[in-house]
Amino acid sequence: MRILRGSPALSEFRVNKLLELCREQDLPVTGIYAEFMHFADLKSDLDDQELEKLEKLLTYGPTIEEHEPEGLLLLVTPRPGTISPWSSKSTDIAINCGLDTVKRLERGTAYYVESSVVLSEAQVDAVKALIHDRMMETVFTELEAASALFTVAEPKPVAHVDILAGGRLALEEANVSLGLALAEDEIDYLVENFTKLGRNPNDIELMMFAQANSEHCRHKIFNADWTIDGVDQEKSLFKMIKNTFETTPDHVLSAYKDNAAVMTGSKVGRFFPDPKSRQYTYHHEDAHILMKVETHNHPTAISPWPGASTGSGGEIRDEGATGIGGKPKAGLVGFTTSNLRIPGFEQPWETDFGKPGRIVNALDIMLEGPLGGAAFNNEFGRPNLLGYFRTYEEKVTSHAGEEVRGYHKPIMIAGGMGNIRDEHVQKKEIPVGASLIVLGGPAMNIGLGGGAASSMASGQSAEDLDFASVQRENPEMERRCQEVIDRCWQLGEENPIAFIHDVGAGGISNALPELCDDGERGGKFQLRDVPNDELSMSPLEIWCNESQERYVLAVAPENMEAFDAICKRERAPYAVVGVATEERHLTLEDSHFDNTPIDMPMDILLGKTPKMHREATTLKVDSPAIARDGIEIDEAADRVLRLPTVAEKTFLITIGDRSVTGLVARDQMVGPWQVPVANCAVTAASYDTYHGEAMSMGERTPVALLDFGASARLAVGESLTNIAATDIGDIKRIKLSANWMSPAGHPGEDAGLYEAVKAVGEELCPALGLTIPVGKDSMSMKTKWEENGESKEVTSPLSLVITAFGRVEDVRKTVTPQLRTSDTLEGLGDTSLVLVDLGNGKNRLGATALAQVYKQLGDKPADVDNAEQLKGFFDAMQNLVRNDKLLAYHDKGDGGLFVTLAEMAFAGHCGVKADIAELGEDALAVLFNEELGAVVQVKNDDLDSVLSTLAANGLEACSHVIGSVEASDDFVFTSGDDVVLKRSRTELRVIWAETTHKMQALRDNPACADQEFEAKKDNTDPGLNVSLSFDVNEDIAAPYIAKGAKPKMAILREQGVNSHVEMAAAFDRAGFEATDIHMSDILTGQAVLDEYQGLVACGGFSYGDVLGAGEGWAKSILFNAQAREQFQAFFNREETFSLGVCNGCQMLSNLKELIPGADLWPRFVRNESERFEARFSLVEVQKSDSVFFDGMAGSRMPIAVSHGEGRVEVRDGEHLNAIEASGTVALRYVDNNGNPTQQYPNNPNGSPNAITGLTTADGRVTIMMPHPERVFRTVANSWAPEGWGENGAWMRMFQNARKNIG
């Protein structure tokens, strides 16, 4: 083993945060220094040349001052016996760089801890707990001890459970020790069946059975028979859900039987490379819509980052594994937790009710979990466009008496939508003899028993089993697998996949039997053919672990050659682990021990286990009305704006890429001031169409404490009032996912669940014409623990989260909450605000945000009293949206009318005057009730026609003209002549932002968080704006395109790159012939660059950014003789041009020694905020010789920014001056007044002199961090000025490239 020192691992503010944590625990630590340590496992000694190459490879990241460390060494490394994603990717790079001597690389972090006194053993343990994740890491106290990382242990054998001698008792003991969560009748079932077989079960068989038959996988409660209040019920819960499909099957292509549901989409030109020529082209066909929403609550409670990350990853796999290959497209995440209690910002309603030690508190869940979910989506390359966040934790009198209700077991929702070809919606038959394949990463000893563990109440299982059930993520691996699936479905009728499932709960022990069973086959498997990174694992651990990023497939023998070629090109590992058999029998052979750990008929594993029967009793709640004493409207407004459910969510949004794909038509951020208040998420179906897809969410979970049915109806209603803001048309085009969370078995909750399912499945959805073709249930939403001998519990309310999906006719019609004034819309004229109140003046306050911030529950909650009226509302809004009658639209939800109008004013940067006299005499109830409805802004010229449309749909009595919009800072509610509330809009905007600021300051660089917060106090901020030196609607490439010649453009990608398709689309539109080129094509000689005139290196996360962003990719070129020669020759050909964007920018900057005129280029390193930044940032084109920016100097326009490592790093001031003097700076960040800026977030990464793009001395090669290819269409811009046509301003760059060739 060779040890190589790396660069410092922690910036100054990260060290300070760690020291602060030490102080909080009274640890006498005075200083901490950390640096990376690299360990190389070698086949033989390195010669000098190889050592120099390896040292260069392992020099990466920002330059932080090094010093000779002192103090106690604590070396954090991956757990011995495991291979980290960092290790596998960096080893790949080393091998691609020709370092064949390297068997494996691994990385640790050496912490040197200085203290005022010698630390005791307990204190050292406390420091260790702060610096490592015990699930995946270990701590050594000397560097040499890291050799344990490379020791290979002996495999453990299979174990038996002796039921033939020990009977039922033996299985009961195994049930506890293995954490199987088997029910009594399942234990009887297993004893009976194995006794019949005349043999003892192996532990692996029992674990496999437990996973396959867990509540998590089998949904026993939803399939159970029910008796309520002594009366047998006709239908199971699942039957009532299916009733929605039986009533309204319209537009549903697949429901209840696959990994995701499918509905009909639009006929569009899907843009992807021709499988033979690899040239990108449009394929005119149906792009059907697939949809799925998952929960990952249990793992997120135990370990938030990986819990949320693998939640998103699993849901993405569900989409990819739909039919015989789908394409994930856009994502959503949602969180419900107990109160945050932010240190120093605790709120009056936040009481501390305690928690068990094994789960994480709500604050840490929300500091870490969202980062995990965002990081997976970012690295995979899926925009995250939607979400919600609710906090609830209170002692209330509910139907079960006085108790604490809250979310110590959080809800973590991960969902999304994608597209699928018509011929791929249904799975095919699995032929006998088909290869049964595991595609993706290796088996690791993590995530054991996740299905069974998540089916128990938090705190019931042993702590080590809880931790064992958490998984770890490697999104770049999943991206590679998805690229394989993409290449397969792009073959159309020749798609080699016959059957596919994702690997989720229960690992391959669930996925492979399910694959065989669904394909009506058996399977014969070889245990030692399963790719395995921990050789010491027992058969149970290999077969049942939940290692992520894996799919199981069936491929006919005659298609294996094509499948193998695709996997090699995409560098996606796979293994044939078995063969499909005619007989429905499952066999698993182990060549190492020469035995058969599994040998059982399929019908014992997945057969008719006993059906559950639930007995339930209805309990009614008697809760008093809200006590008004001491509630002042002004203070109520402030409190409600600080409630996390209502407060600004920027800290949850800018961490997630919202522009990747170039197909995003509506993200969360709205208008020139980029305020996060969008009603719904919208994507375009392709680059040649305005058809698209939309997603929205609805949930009102605290209402279930008063009325189960109302809570469920409101969730459906809110999803509709949100999605009504876009152009859907017929309500039957909308399909819902229903995610049900319940503390099953808690007094009154089972009957309540039945009531809620009936309310939507049998009543509301059929009345509206809505279908629920997909969903999930999580039936153990309770946390129990002991504290000082007292048993405690926190029980969640019944929680239904609805996600609505719909096909969009025209994405341009989407209306946002941004109020318009003549400042933002020329020639606007007078406008009015109209409230449509679906509560019909009832103004009920039960379980509202207002009630919560005063520690109350109230009596009657809002409800959907009239389904016909709700449908009329949707139809009316669709008419008005389609006919361009609405300037602004915002649904009424948490926080009521007050919050609806406040958010509209924040987005419009304007004032509001509203008179609420005709809405009721109780001003508090009028302002803060959460009845369904919406506020719209309309031109006074259109007011009569809008009101008559509302009346024609039965809404006349509940439609009220309530006020006007003003270009001012005044936010005023009156009731006749009486002023009810008069505030500064800016002041309210700042209060609304406090929560996001506090969370950002705790999690990211606090200096950046403070700058962003300060900027929100500036009422004079003009917002995003555009100033162009050219005509955006002129196509300067048109004359060259007309000639018919198409110059050849290499669209270059490496493993982990995810922005290549939109880049190809932009160059294709500009008249180029765009060709898909993977780095593996170059390294294997399948592609040569001398055939191309242009080359573009695309954005993403090459090699997961393990050796610095873009650095691994660059080094695999620099240190590979053949690749180096090709690239050098290309850059030296004078007729060529090149572009590097984001990851491609980072990569080309590291190739500068090969690029003429690039010698001054800087490096790009970690953002100053130390966070991935997804922003819509204003930039100005500088005067330079770049062929891309010809005629654009002085132009100022916004652009998509999405990166974690975009900060320009120069050697010193002299280097920076030389760059400026050379005239090669091509782009700078500017503020909204047009000045180059260092202020965050206008300068999202802290680059000196606001530099974000450079070119070479002759202008042939340009690099830039922002993404022009994602916003080349006007509809793909988060905000664009009126008057832009189909092409956005950034399309000019690509047209310039075409014009330059002539």
Curated annotation (Swiss-Prot):
Pfam families: AIRS_C, FGAR-AT_linker, FGAR-AT_N, FGAR-AT_PurM_N-like, GATase_5. ATP binds at G307, A308, S309, T310, G311, S312, G313, G314, E315, I316, R317, D318, A678. Keywords: ATP-binding, Cytoplasm, Glutamine amidotransferase, Ligase, Magnesium, Metal-binding, Nucleotide-binding, Purine biosynthesis. GO terms for cellular component: cytoplasm. The keyword Zinc does not apply. GO terms for biological process: 'de novo' IMP biosynthetic process. It is found in: Cytoplasm. Transmembrane segments: none annotated. It is an enzyme of class 6 (ligase). CDD domains: GATase1_FGAR_AT, PurL_repeat1. Residues 1049-1302 form the Glutamine amidotransferase type-1 domain. It comes from the Bacteria. Signal peptide: none annotated. The active site is at C1142 (nucleophile), H1267, E1269. Its EC number is 6.3.5.3. The keyword Metal-binding applies. PANTHER family: PHOSPHORIBOSYLFORMYLGLYCINAMIDINE SYNTHASE. Monomer. Phosphoribosylformylglycinamidine synthase involved in the purines biosynthetic pathway. Catalyzes the ATP-dependent conversion of formylglycinamide ribonucleotide (FGAR) and glutamine to yield formylglycinamidine ribonucleotide (FGAM) and glutamate. This is Phosphoribosylformylglycinamidine synthase.
